[in-house]
Each structure stands twice: as C-alpha cells, then as structure tokens.
Amino acid sequence: MREVNFNIPNVNKASVNITTTLYDRRALDCTSTLPLINSLNHLAYLTTSSARIRDILTVDGGIERLVCILKEGRSRDLMEMWKWSLAFQCVVNIGVRGSESVRTRVVEADMVPVIATILDNYIKVVDKARARADSESQRQSSRHHSKAVPTSNDVSGRPSFLEQPLTAEQRTSRRHAPPSIEIPPQPFFQENHVADSNVLDVTSPSRVPMTSPPERSAFGQDVHHRRTNDGRFAHGNHRHRMQPLATALPSMDATDGFGLRPVRDNERLPSMLPGFHTGLTSQPDSPTTPNAPVQPRSSAQATIARQRPSLRQQQSASGESDDGNGDGSTMDEDPASTEAAEPIVGLQNRMDIDDVGDRDTILGGVSDSHDLTVTDPSEEQEAETFNITHRSTVDGSMINTDNAQNNAALGLSPTQAADNANSPALVPSPYSLYFRDRTTTAAHGVLTTMPRDEDVLMSLQLLAYVSKYCNLRSYFQHSHFVPKLKIDRELQMLEEGTSPIEFPEDEDEYLLPDDVNIFPLVEKFTVRHHSKDMQYWACVVMRNLCRKDESRGGIRQCAYYKCGKWEEFQRQFAKCRRCRRTKYCSKDCQKAAWVYHRHWCHTTP
C-alpha cells in the first residue's frame, strides 16, 4: 500500500511540503504534524495572494482535505491547535477572497457545519460564563450586604443614599455635564434601552466598569478632581450596593469630547497597568513613537477613522465585486445608521466614567473576580489597522514581495515578515479571562477547547461572503453540528455539585440529520454584549437572508427562521416598516422574530 507521507530522497527531503513559491497537493496528505504545519503556514500566504492557487484548491481536493482537518476537532496539544488554526485560516482566505465559483466550492465542501459548531460552542461558553459570573456576584453582594447592614433604628431613621436631598452645588453638577466632555447623540441601538435592559443586561449590580485601552481612555485631571471632590462619591461603601450609573449614561466618544494626552502612572486604571494581562502587549500610541503625546483629531478625521469600509469597497483578489448584484448587504447602505453617531469599527465609542475616582477600591477588587463587562476588541485599534485575518498569520496585502523572496532565500517564513510593529495586540475575550483565572482543571479544559474570538469573527465574515448567493441557502438552513468539535463534555465538567453525565458515543457525522439552521445562531451575535465586529458581520449575514432569489423570479423568503415560507409572486409579503428590507408572511411571524430582529433592524428614510 502506498505511503501517504511522500518524500524526495534526491533532495534530502523527508516529506513534500508547500513553500511560498511552490504548491504541491501531496503536502496536504502528510500525517506528520510538523511538516503539515509548515505547509499550511505557507499555504495561508498563497491563498491570500494568489487567485490561481485558490482556483486550483477547488479542483484538486485541497478544500476537502482542509475541511477534514477541521472536522478532526481541536486538541489540547499546542501543535494540533496550531495545525487546526492554520487550516481554518486557509479556508477563510479561500472563501473571502475567492470568486463566486470558489466560494460555492467552499460551501459544497461541507464547511458550513464547521462554522455552525464554532458559533454554537461560543454561544454556550458565553452563556455559561455569564451565568456563573452573575451567581458569584450575587453571592458576593449578598455576603457584603449582610456584613454592612446597620441596626434597624439607623435604617428607619436615616434616608437611603438615593433619597438624600442634594445641595445646590450637587444639583447644579447633576444638571450640567462637565464642560470638557460633550455627550454625542445616542447610538441607534439605545433606542430601546429600557426594553432591552430586562433581557440583555450585561453589567450586573456588583460589577465595576473598567475601560481600556490607555490611549483612548485618558481622563483630564480637572475631571478627576471634580468627581473625587463631589459629595456623591464621598461614601465609598454605597458604591457596591447599587448598580453603577454608567449603565444609565449615554455612550460617548472620547475623541469627540476632549483632547487626549498621555496617561501618568498614578492615573492608570487596572486595565492599563503593566502586567495586568499576562502575556499581552498594549498597542502603542504610534508605531514609531510609542511615548509621543496623542494629538487631538478633528471631527472629520475621527469620523473617517470610525467608518468601516463596506463590502462594496473590499474587492477580492480575483477582481470580483464582493457585494454581488444589488440589494446591498452591508450596514453602510443605511443612511440613518451612518448619520447617527454609531461607529461600526474604530475608536472606542463608550466610556464608563462612573466610579473612576476611587481607584484604590478598583485595584482592590481586581483579584476577586473578573468583570464580564464586555470591552470591544475592535475599539482598541484604529479602523485602518483592522483586518479580519489576524496579523499574526500571513496577510498578503501587507507583505512586500521583495522581502518575501529574501526571507524565502534565508529560510524564513513570510509570517515573520508580516509580524511588525503595526500588528495590533489581540485582546482576549472577557469570557476567556474569566475561565483563565479559575484554577480548576475543568475551567482550563474549556479555555483550551472554546473557540477564540478570531475564529468566531472569521466564521461570521466567511458567512457574510458566501450567504449572499441564494442558490446556496439550503446549505445554511439544513446543516448539522460536527461531533468532534462540540464541547458539551467540557462545559458539563464546570457544573459544581452535579454528578457527571455519561454522554453517548458520538455518532458518525454522515448519520446525523441536517436539522440545524445557522441563521438563528448568527442572529444571536447581533446582540449588544458581543463585540462591534461580531455584530457588524452578523448583521451582514442576516441582511443577506433578506435577498430576493433572482433565479426564482425575484421572490423573497419569510425572514422568520421557523417559517421559511417563500413568496408565490413578487411583493406578496409585507416589509418591515422600520428597515424596509425584511419581509414576513404574517404579523405572527413578525412578532415572533422581533425578539432578535430589533438588534439588526435599522431605520431607513
């Protein structure tokens, strides 16, 4: 029987591998991990820069082989995890940068079940982390409240903190905002803040809001003294017994209100302190002058930096427009969403200014439990540096061909050429930080097997590019989960005080029914507590669901996933009055779908 590990003895090669100048399909069949990682590392570069390589992979079985590597599951071994990540990067490059035929082949190679499993795992981990964090915070708040409760006479005779009369100075300070801070208009997602807070309240009553990074959360010294000298903040013990006021304040952009300056060491928040995040390096203010003062930008420059380039502007390497033929699929086409002060990607548009004065208390509470108030990773880097394919892997748009050739002659990987000072530091998810601080074996097991934020982000982006083809919609609405990629066992180990459940052996994947609709999974990422990038790409996918099928006479499908009814003729279904894009066959479907549709329903004039 033929050995799958091909070798070339005459050139002293133990295995065939892929280089930056040579593609050999036999290298993907290698069963040894190290040479396969080497080949996948170079293939990631080739799939980014060469349209011909992407086309070849669709006809020689290369995509199927990459999907098989992904379906083998994530292992706790570092080399196996590296192999899985590189294979996933290659498939995303092929699907995002390829032509319509190439993207069709990616979907036909059964990539959708892999994406569905990744999204489902991430949702389960987020729900588990939030549930455990809420229960822990409630226990801590109840224990703290029991220790700090005064006598009954004092309670009956003294008004509460919220009932105390305000002095004239305090009333004035409450009525008027500080002169150095300007509050911009509320974003579009805060229209239903009161209605949403009952279901999707991210900040629990006992958590302390924290802001990052240092270059975009610098507070003026006058603001600091004004808040610390205010009588409302003199009672530090009341802060832990009430919900932070930051949840009731409208979000604001730091760059629009006041000029930024370097942060002194004695003014740093916990998230700014060196060594607070182990193994992470913060992004400098400037790639060339890390300690240079940050200059205030004009409103026009800030607006440009906050705007995300639409899919219409992101051309694939093969020269095809990524937006298809009309019926736009991006959020940029919504004039109301662009005119409202809601940046999709870019500078930090939210600053929790409450409880900043008492920094010692904040530092003292860091070690107890991690705050799961989500800080958006996309807000910690400039819009021009945002790239969905993270810079630690190869990005052909940033690589100089001369340098790549020189590195190849020296035996270096192109990854080293792309990894420079402009590469932003990847900020871990607050949920991964939550599990990382837990010393139990089960928590570390979940941490090693849970999808990374980059994996979820690339999955959503890949779906955004392939879901706009209506002839492929059946692949998204009738899919399944990959058994070897599921993390139900690891999540079950986190349950304390429960007997372990004996899970049945995983069935073969080909025996599983295709009863999973991926659109409800994607719709859950449009909720606010996910990062802005996840919300953006999830909204693009959901808007692609509203496209009309030109091959069937321009009819549309009911947007409620449990219905899925198609129009019998054009304009049979009524559109949503707010977004004028989503169609429903009945009022009942519209009411049932509004629970999540409100998060990606944007007003159009």
Curated annotation (Swiss-Prot):
UniProt region (Disordered), positions on chain: 134-187, 203-352
Bias-annotated ranges (Acidic residues): 320-336
GO cellular component terms listed in the entry, alphabetical order: cytoplasm; MUB1-RAD6-UBR2 ubiquitin ligase complex
Main location: cytoplasm
Keywords: Cytoplasm, Metal-binding, Sporulation, Zinc, Zinc-finger
GO MF annotation list: zinc ion binding
Biased amino acid composition, Polar residues: 279-315
First and last residues of each zinc finger (MYND-type): 560-601
Gene3D superfamilies in alphabetical order: 6.10.140.2220
Superkingdom in the source lineage: Eukaryota
Protein's cellular compartments: Cytoplasm
GO biological-process terms attached to the record: establishment or maintenance of cell polarity; positive regulation of flocculation; sporulation resulting in formation of a cellular spore; ubiquitin-dependent protein catabolic process
Positions annotated to bind Zn(2+): 576, 579, 597, 601
Protein function: Involved in determination of the onset of polarized growth and morphogenesis. Plays a role in the regulation of branching in hyphae and spore formation.
Similarity remark: Belongs to the MUB1/samB family.
Protein name, as recorded: MYND-type zinc finger protein samB
Species this protein is from: Aspergillus fumigatus (strain ATCC MYA-4609 / CBS 101355 / FGSC A1100 / Af293) (Neosartorya fumigata)
